[in-house]
């Protein structure tokens, strides 16, 4: 596959969605939103209109290579087909409600999805530009150090609301090309939500990201991060091949049970066994997984815990990202000191692990790891909060 740059209430132990179930909100119109369809589905849709498969490919190219949403702009499509598409279909990406820019070049967008918002983050670096994409409105997993989890859970995002984040960001970044803004080269499913609890919408969206007529990214440049929904991870390996990152954050079950509650259902040993099964199937990971480990002061950052982590991971090929914890209002944790992070990192490297201390990006606009909140109406009837404003607002039930 050629690679191009992109310019233009659920319980913790909820089972993965079945093959024929997609959680969505009702579309705003009766027209088909083409952003909900991967290439196979697009071809089926065009076949139903009596059109040949290459017409679907042409439209996809205009949609994703050029970020066009008006059929009249698609000049190699005959007028009759353009008129037919205008009647039965649309290209409708979620709109930006708010944009914030960090001093380090990071951009955070609050994206409107129905009457709520999710957050999408663009992170430029010297050799790449990564887009962090959300998969759910809120999150059901209740990880104690994560701002998103404190908002509760509302619903899964549709395919169009996931790939639409990439489409919208690519269109904005494309408009900034003259300023030297780097095109998107990588996408990470590390925004709001647990991607494996929305598998039937996340997988088609990632498929479009990697499709030559979509955004054309290589499978090594599309990463899914999970906290450990083991049955869905096994299912993922049979559905698609993408890079995998795991949110581990603790070397022992007693600590992980407290800060990542899904561990009470799928413990570390069970989780890592599933990771190894995925690696056996995957070519996207280069034989190893990325382990994410948020550093919490005097919670999981001692030298002894570094040794425990090395022992825990000895049978799992991996590289380790140590992530400075990013605070949010009301959180009971503190960020590990640089000296504790350095000692922790040195222990892991002595065991031979590739260990990287992640540089915090966008923390001045609450766009760093663990800070994404958006606006969530929680179906479990917790208090609705809009963290971007930093103030609680009235409860609204669904």
Curated annotation (Swiss-Prot):
Pfam families: Radical_SAM, RlmN_N. Its main location: cytoplasm. It is found in: Cytoplasm. The active site is at residues 119, 369. GO terms for cellular component: cytoplasm. Keywords: 4Fe-4S, Cytoplasm, Disulfide bond, Iron, Iron-sulfur, Metal-binding, Methyltransferase, rRNA processing, S-adenosyl-L-methionine, Transferase, tRNA processing. S-adenosyl-L-methionine binds at residues 193-194, 225, 247-249, 326. The keyword 4Fe-4S applies. Disulfide bonds join 132-369. InterPro entries: Aldolase_TIM, Methyltransferase_A, RlmN_N, RNA_MTrfase_RlmN, rRNA_lsu_MTrfase_RlmN/Cfr, rSAM. Residues 125-364 form the Radical SAM core domain. [4Fe-4S] cluster binds at residues 139, 143, 146. GO terms for biological process: rRNA base methylation; tRNA methylation. GO terms for molecular function: 4 iron, 4 sulfur cluster binding; metal ion binding; rRNA (adenine(2503)-C2-)-methyltransferase activity; rRNA binding; tRNA (adenine(37)-C2)-methyltransferase activity; tRNA binding. The keyword Phosphoprotein does not apply. Its EC number is 2.1.1.192. It catalyses: adenosine(2503) in 23S rRNA + 2 reduced [2Fe-2S]-[ferredoxin] + 2 S-adenosyl-L-methionine = 2-methyladenosine(2503) in 23S rRNA + 5'-deoxyadenosine + L-methionine + 2 oxidized [2Fe-2S]-[ferredoxin] + S-adenosyl-L-homocysteine; adenosine(37) in tRNA + 2 reduced [2Fe-2S]-[ferredoxin] + 2 S-adenosyl-L-methionine = 2-methyladenosine(37) in tRNA + 5'-deoxyadenosine + L-methionine + 2 oxidized [2Fe-2S]-[ferredoxin] + S-adenosyl-L-homocysteine. NCBIfam families: PRK11194.1 (NF008396), rRNA_mod_RlmN (TIGR00048). Reaction proceeds by a ping-pong mechanism involving intermediate methylation of a conserved cysteine residue. Specifically methylates position 2 of adenine 2503 in 23S rRNA and position 2 of adenine 37 in tRNAs. m2A2503 modification seems to play a crucial role in the proofreading step occurring at the peptidyl transferase center and thus would serve to optimize ribosomal fidelity. Belongs to the radical SAM superfamily. RlmN family. This is Dual-specificity RNA methyltransferase RlmN. It comes from Yersinia pestis. The lineage of its organism: Bacteria, Pseudomonadati, Pseudomonadota, Gammaproteobacteria, Enterobacterales.
């Amino acid at each position: 596959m050629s690679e191009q740059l992109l310019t233009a209430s659920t319980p913790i132990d909820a089972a993965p969605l079945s093959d024929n179930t997609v959680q969505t909100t009702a579309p705003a119109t009766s027209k088909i939103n083409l952003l909900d369809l991967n290439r196979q589905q697009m071809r089926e849709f065009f076949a139903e209109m009596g059109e040949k498969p290459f017409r679907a490919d042409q439209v996809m190219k205009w949609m994703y290579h050029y970020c066009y949403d008006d059929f009249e702009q698609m000049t190699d499509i005959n007028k009759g087909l353009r008129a037919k598409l205008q009647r039965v279909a649309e290209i409708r990406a979620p709109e930006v409600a708010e944009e914030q820019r960090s001093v380090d070049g990071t951009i955070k967008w609050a994206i409107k999805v129905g009457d709520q918002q999710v957050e999408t983050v663009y992170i430029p670096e010297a050799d790449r530009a990564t887009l962090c994409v959300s998969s759910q409105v809120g999150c059901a997993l209740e990880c104690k150090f994560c701002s998103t989890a404190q908002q509760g859970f509302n619903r899964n995002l549709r395919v169009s609301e996931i790939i639409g984040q990439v489409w919208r960001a690519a269109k904005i970044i494309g408009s900034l090309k003259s300023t030297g803004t780097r095109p998107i080269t990588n996408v990470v499913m590390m925004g709001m939500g647990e991607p494996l609890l929305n598998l039937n919408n996340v997988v088609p969206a990632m498929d479009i990201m990697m499709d030559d007529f979509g955004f054309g990214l290589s499978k090594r440049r599309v990463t899914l991060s999970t906290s450990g929904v083991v049955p869905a991870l096994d299912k993922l390996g049979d559905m698609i091949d993408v890079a995998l990152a795991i949110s581990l954050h603790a070397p022992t079950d007693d600590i992980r049970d407290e800060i990542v509650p899904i561990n009470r259902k799928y413990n570390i040993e069970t989780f890592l066994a599933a990771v190894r099964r995925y690696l056996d199937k995957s070519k996207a990971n280069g034989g190893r997984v990325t382990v994410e480990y948020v550093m919490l002061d005097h919670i999981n950052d001692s030298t002894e815990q570094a040794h425990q982590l090395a022992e825990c991971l000895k049978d799992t090929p991996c590289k380790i990202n140590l992530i400075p914890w990013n605070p949010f209002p009301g959180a009971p944790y503190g960020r590990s000191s640089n000296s504790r992070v350095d000692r922790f990192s040195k222990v892991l490297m002595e065991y031979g692990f590739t260990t990287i201390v992640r540089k915090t990006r966008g923390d001045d606009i609450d766009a760093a790891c663990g800070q994404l909140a958006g606006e969530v109406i929680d179906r479990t009837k917790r208090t609705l909060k809009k963290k971007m404003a930093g103030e609680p607002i009235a409860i609204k039930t669904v």
